[in-house]
Amino acid sequence: MKLRIQFNAAKATRNFTKHRVRLADAEAVLYDPIALTVEDNDHDEQRWVTIGVDGSGQILVVVYVYRDPNFIRLISARKAQPQETIQYQGA
């Protein structure tokens, strides 16, 4: 099933400036069949964190919220840290 994915343009610019990762490129992580996803309980809203591969083969960490079962708003994306890469590769 195709997800509807959105992000705020200003937030996407800040994310690229800070992490050098485009939110538009990070969408592919959500379609990675072996991605690792956990709930992030550190926030008021229910957030999810997924470690997976983007379209260029780079391992990314993507944070997002569900607006409904098929509608996602991306919050941030960054390159995986070494320990996150090991976690992903061991999955």
What are the functions of these language-model segments?
Residues 1-91:
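Ribonuclease/tRNase effector modules and their secretory precursors
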